[in-house]
Amino acid sequence: KAADEDAKRAWRATLGREERQRSSVYTTTEVIVSAFADERVRSQTEDPSYTPPRLLDKRKNTLYLCAPLQEQERLHPLFSMLVQELLSYAYEKAAIKGALDPPLLLLLDEAANIAPIPDLDAIASTGAGEGIQLLSVFQDMAQVGTVYGKRAATIVNNHRAKMFGAGISDRETLEYISRVAGSAEFEQRSRSRAERGRRSMTEGDTYRDLAPANVVREHKPGSALLMYGALPMAKLDLRIHLDTRR
């Protein structure tokens, strides 16, 4: 198989490396393949019922990758590899036949833990044109920065829609929402009373933040703020996922 030949060439190239480089390659490889020490992992990945072409065969197919909290770190190299393999095939297919139809929904819940994708910023900016709809879920902006460093802002900006749930306590996230929402001009009136009882009123304009950090933090559970493209920010009431009413 072509994949086997690629693996053999990579192995021969590794053997020819300087000893310290070879040691580094071995260490990285051990981390990546450690998940395959689990018999359950080997049996599932050897199952021929899943391949990227079969998943994208125009039928209503779904691939779930999930792991309990204590296994996420061990399995995330495997999960990342599976997602990147799928994306590579999806981009190749789109390059030949045009945007995927039906499109591929790539839903990355706990995107920083389950299957961190190295080039998430590029996928966020180019995926839509190839028929790939990307939904990334992070706990807060701080988590994005921890995983992706300087590319964190690019990743967030490349997602056209951004939704923020209630109860946010991360300062960076609150400041981001307030800064992007901006401010608006409001009419302000003030009344005063002189010592002899005379009253006066003054009118003027003032600028106020549209989404002050404290107001965003105090949003009730079940609500969210939506930023979409150049549209004004909107407040949403969320529907419980078990509620199937239309």
Predicted regions and their residues:
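H-loop/switch region of ABC-family ATPase nucleotide-binding domains
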Residues: 138
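Alpha-helix N-cap/helix-start and coil->helix boundary motif
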Residues: 72, 113, 141, 170-171
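P-loop NTPase motor domains
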Residues: 1-132, 147, 206, 211-235, ...
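P-loop NTPase motor core of the ASCE superfamily
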Residues: 60, 121-125, 143-246
